[in-house]
Amino acid sequence: MTSEQAGSRQLKHDDDAEHKSPQQTTKWRNNAHSAARGRSCVRAATDLRFSTTKSSSEQNSPTCRAGLQASGTLLRLSSVGDVGGYARRRQGRATVVPDVKVRKMRLAGAGLTFISQSAVPEVRAAPVAKARNAALDRTRTFLTLVVLFHHAVIPYTYFGHTDPKSFVGFDMVVLATDSFFMAMFFLLSGLFVWPGLVRKGPRHYLLDRVLRLGLPFAIGALTIIPVAYYALSLRQQPEVGFADFWWKTVTVGPWPSGPIWFLWVLFGLDVIASLVYVISPKALDPINHLSLQAREQPAKFVLVMFAVTAVLYIPGRIYFGAGNWFEFGPFSVQHGRVLLYACYFFFGAGIGVANLNGGLLAADGRLAKGNWIWIPTVLIPYCCMWGLVYIKREILENPVQLPHWYEGIYGFFFAWFSMAIVFGILAFFLRFERAGRSILDAMQPDAFGMFLIHYPIVLWLQYWMFDLELPAIAKALIAFGLTVLLSWGATILLRKIPGAKHVL
């Protein structure tokens, strides 16, 4: 419309107003002024300078809401006129989607639609359900199955077997699994630490961890673990009853913790992370920035993490050795791996500080697209570790105390292999995140419970098969298959107990 046309229309409206009653004239002029103010708000909302160009009263006016509706940019206006609310920036634009149907009214002569305040006093954003990360869920469930398989084959390894039957292939499995799976659990656990601290605060976060980690550890140490190790005791002292064995375990010792040592170590790292968060909430931002860059350059992140883990792990292995454990009652952990686990945990926490799905672990990132490169990256250090095992057994004659040079070289390849296979597994599951349904999806809610209760099941199955004339492979597969089914079924039943889902 030209300025001349606008002036003619205004004169016509003024002439019409002369023939109206004073009340009609006032109403007409209010509508005209409202239309002008609405158009002003349209322009302000379009260039996203709304909060600075309009006063609080103007921002809350129905006509400004009309301007926002007409411009296609709908913002939630709070009672004090602030436009923060549910507006969120996505690629430089503020967007929000209303979750209510509203009654529309049309301004006479203005051609603008606005939201009636009598119909809806405030536009609310639809709550967005937190979507689970299928790739990480499947990775965690897969790792749980790796733990079960690891424990199912240990008695049937060629070196150090406890069953009459053995198979050297299981030594190859155990060498690989023992080198990475617990470190990877700490990495995955760390991913969600910072979001939990931000959402709940350190106090409530730690209370939640006491429920999720401390309570299962206490119950497991007093019940699950003694039941599991009683199967081993019967082979050596069949005359000892379970009550006597249990009492001796918890009073005199030794009191092994089995695989649940992971729970108390993880809780300890959660406590440290909470203290770090209180002191400096941005302490892990450098790791997060590195993760965001790793969306396109994952090699940089992997190399930095490898360098840090190697520096922290190798000295501990040289000083303590590979088989030295800290033990205090049911609290136990390998001395030489404490810093390795802490490193994985805090790197995971750094990745999860912000944009978890937009950095290193992005489903469309470079890590997810480079699966094949991980095969040689994993095989090279693994073969070198086997070469060192040969040197230890055939040349050094398997000494109790290995020379420092040996531990240092082995520690280097151990850190390399652990890093490579962890990110290789992550790359695989990220690549096939959308590849339909998987049995891992069905197992995912019960994976933690399976981890907690599988140990007595697998040890008692091995006890009952000890005297059977079956090949080692058959025994291991039977033990693994039944352990998966029985621990899964038991977890499903236990989770039906009121309140159990908060723990299992």
Predicted stretch roles:
Residues 7, 38, 67, 72, ...:
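Residue-identity detector for glycine
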